[in-house]
Amino acid sequence: FTELEIKDIESKAYQMGVKTYQNIDAVESYYQKVVKFLIFGNVLKNNTYPLSVSAERSIQALEIIKYAKKINADYVAHGSTGAGNDQVRFDLIFQTLAPEIKIITPIRDQHLSRQEEIQFLIANGIELTWSKAKYSINKGLWGTSIGGQETLTSHLPLPEEAYPSQLQKKDEQQVQLTFSKGELVAVNKEQDLPHKCIEKLNKLASKYAIGRDIHVGDTILGIKGRVGFEAAAATITIKAHHLLEKHILTKWQLQHKEYLSNWYGTHLHEGLFLDPVMRDFEAFLESSQTQVSGHVYVSLKPYHFAIDGVVSENDLMDTDFGTYGEENKRWTADEAKGFIKIYANHIKRVKQTHR
């Protein structure tokens, strides 16, 4: 959030009657504990969603309960409904780390709809942009989710105006992303902390309205859900990082990483951040990144992007070793024939035996 947005949130909080307001900056912690591993794993839920909101809920819960214990609070509250995933993510961590603190959930307990919430705020003189209030918008480092009446259906798209970032630029622009051991450390040769680079990339790419989609998935409670999102930096970073990995990692590293990364993303999505197996996944993912360094070139265009290519000292696509589909320099034709003959043995045996 910008300083202006944070000030506006604080103003609204006092307008609604809070006694004290506290803003907790946990962006660096969020990156180090979660986002970094989502990048290492190229995590996209159902090959679509970069876990923009579900990824941050665990860190929010951890930071909230830490603050609640610091001030010796007897109660902690959250605004989740009784129909979604967030109630599980918050309650699970609150119950686990502070069972003595009572959880208050007014929206869940009173079965309040979004429209009822809006009417309550209007009746109490709270001023908001009500055209926007009809959408549930969750903004964070790794993207923004958008939910509304359209996403409660299986066929309606979100209208253009529902997306926070609108198309501002139409001229194509190429950017250079620099990775060091799997982490994004520079955008257009300007080095910075990884989470700052993500923010910088998002600022550039959001002007092209990149990263929009609608995710359909299974909730923790067992029902299908649909949510819109925009995540320019997340989608670009994941795709750029994945291409760099394709050039650097072995085929077995890539294959084993893929299914372990999916499990990591699934556990995180379902509120299981505190499960010890997550630390095991993270250790594997971190180990896989020791050679993943280099530059990736990305072209930004209206509503989409293209990954152009990579430059890395660790690139295994070595033309001195051989050129795919063209020529080789390390083996003879007879050696190739002998390899294929031996390689085919198990298939030949099956075909000869199972007639």
List each model region and its residues.
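Nucleotide-activated chemistry modules centered on ATP-dependent adenylation/adenylyltransferase
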Residues: 1-355
